[in-house]
């Protein structure tokens, strides 16, 4: 990065999950950081505020020609601040291009895949940090900059092929699935992006072995597969899933690597952990230390975040794709096998809702009862040709639409688990329910 630490780094869209993480990394490494965004509150700004990073409202007057402007991917060059920076001749660099440049001095590990990126990056960062100095950037708004870091672990998003800016030493690839239908044309189009990424990895790829698309990857570096099959290089055996978490033995081919206990739920989290263990194993880290660090993992933001209110368990999860909904419900059933599971889902984007309508209905029907919230449009689309009622008609386990002003139908359930899922603002429905539940007299045994 040269001698640019004394420059002022201005983040356009600092409340974005990746942008806030990167801002924290730079701040903790001693860089001078500030940013701007809309005035609406986002959960990502809490850590920025705790760290003393200034957050300003969007205004072209925030920009000075001597600063380095890091532009969030959601904002075009015509945005008032970016346009002013270009006009003044300030250095403007996109988020993913900045990261590509920033990671060069480190042993870099990119975590990518259609699902599971954030949880896997969080676990990887937690494990590595407990063993060696590590900087990391997680998609839940968490970032950490270690002054003398050996490793840099980061989440690499496939949306609009942004991850092709990176040439990491290692990559964990969790899966390939059809998502982001506003950009990708087909599953083959998604695969082509991952195939290009595979050619850019410098040392090795760790890929989920039960994914038929990942099995087709071609690369100049070794591809190590992890999973439960005898064909996998890194295998989980003797898996035990209980209400306390999951435990399993790990083998490299027929060589015993170690016994691991993961305080997380769902088959998908075991697979995510295998990817992390594989990286640590091939980097020759102490497997006993890896197991110890894994035992203390507390999870990441908005991934099966739970609380108890009255007689109810309330879960908040970012799941916004059918595969993620299935995984979240699977985790809930593992932890609470004797409780009714109530799903409250807010679809994210009209294009995704249309493209995956039947798959959403099938996934949601794994719950005991389903409630829906109106579709959350993204910054790129505010309306579409699909209604939430269209999804509701395909769901067999309910499908009633609730509003923020009336979540009272959820009061019909007692001693159950209510799982709020979505990538939009589903948390406002959760908060409305929590408030209503707290103010309701119930017979709690």
UniProtKB/Swiss-Prot annotation:
Keywords: ATP-binding, Cell cycle, Cell division, Cell shape, Cell wall biogenesis/degradation, Cytoplasm, Ligase, Nucleotide-binding, Peptidoglycan synthesis. It holds the Pfam family Mur_ligase_C. Pathway: Cell wall biogenesis; peptidoglycan biosynthesis. GO terms for cellular component: cytoplasm. It catalyses: UDP-N-acetyl-alpha-D-muramate + L-alanine + ATP = UDP-N-acetyl-alpha-D-muramoyl-L-alanine + ADP + phosphate + H(+). InterPro entries: Mur-like_cat_sf, Mur_ligase_C, Mur_ligase_C_dom_sf, Mur_ligase_cen, Mur_ligase_N, MurCDEF_pg_biosynth, UDP-N-AcMur_Ala_ligase_MurC. The keyword Iron-sulfur does not apply. Its EC number is 6.3.2.8. One of its GO terms (biological process) is cell division. The keyword tRNA-binding does not apply. GO terms for molecular function: ATP binding; UDP-N-acetylmuramate-L-alanine ligase activity. Its main location: cytoplasm. ATP binds at residues 113-119. It is found in: Cytoplasm. It is an enzyme of class 6 (ligase). Cell wall formation. Belongs to the MurCDEF family. This is UDP-N-acetylmuramate--L-alanine ligase. It comes from Enterococcus faecalis (strain ATCC 700802 / V583).
């Amino acid at each position: 990065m040269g001698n640019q630490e004394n420059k002022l780094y201005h983040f356009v869209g600092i409340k974005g999950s990746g942008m806030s993480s990167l801002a924290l990394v730079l701040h903790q490494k001693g860089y001078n950081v500030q940013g701007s965004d809309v005035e609406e509150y986002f959960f990502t700004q809490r850590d920025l505020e705790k760290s003393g990073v200034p957050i300003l409202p969007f205004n072209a007057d925030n920009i000075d020609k001597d600063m380095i402007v890091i532009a969030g991917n959601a904002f075009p060059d015509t945005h008032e601040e970016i346009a002013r920076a270009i006009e003044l001749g300030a250095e403007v660099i996109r988020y993913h291009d900045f990261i590509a440049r920033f990671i060069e001095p480190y042993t870099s590990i990119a975590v990518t895949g259609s699902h599971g990126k954030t949880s896997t990056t969080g676990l990887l960062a937690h494990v590595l940090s407990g063993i060696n100095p590590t900087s990391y950037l997680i998609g839940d708004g968490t970032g950490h900059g270690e002054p003398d870091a050996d490793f840099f672990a980061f989440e690499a998003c496939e949306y609009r092929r942004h991850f092709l800016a990176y040439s990491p030493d290692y990559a964990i690839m969790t899966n390939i699935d059809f998502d982001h239908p506003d950009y990708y044309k087909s599953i083959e189009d998604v695969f082509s992006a991952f195939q290009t990424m595979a050619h850019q990895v410098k040392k090795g790829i760790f890929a989920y072995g039960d994914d038929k698309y990942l099995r087709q990857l071609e690369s100049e570096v070794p591809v190590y597969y992890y999973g439960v099959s005898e064909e996998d290089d890194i295998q989980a055996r003797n898996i035990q899933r209980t209400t306390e978490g999951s435990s399993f033995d790990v083998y490299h081919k027929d060589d015993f690597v170690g016994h691991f206990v993961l305080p997380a739920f769902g088959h998908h989290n075991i697979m995510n952990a295998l990817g992390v263990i594989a990286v640590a194993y091939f980097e020759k880290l102490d497997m006993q230390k890896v197991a110890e660090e894994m035992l203390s993992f507390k999870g990441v933001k908005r991934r099966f975040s739970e609380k108890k209110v009255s007689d109810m368990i309330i879960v908040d999860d970012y799941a916004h794709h059918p595969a993620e909904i299935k995984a979240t419900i699977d985790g809930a059933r593992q932890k609470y096998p004797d409780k009714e599971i109530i799903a409250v889902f807010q679809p994210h984007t009209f294009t995704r809702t249309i493209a995956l309508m039947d798959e959403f209905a099938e996934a949601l029907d794994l719950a005991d009862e389903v409630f829906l919230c109106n579709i959350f449009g993204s910054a790129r689309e505010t309306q579409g040709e699909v209604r939430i009622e269209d999804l509701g008609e395909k769901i067999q386990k309910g499908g009633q639409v609730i509003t923020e002003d009336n979540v009272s139908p959820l009061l019909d359930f007692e001693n159950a688990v209510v799982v709020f899922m979505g990538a939009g603002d589903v948390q406002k429905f959760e908060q409305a329910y929590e408030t209503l539940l707290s103010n309701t007299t119930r017979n709690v045994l």
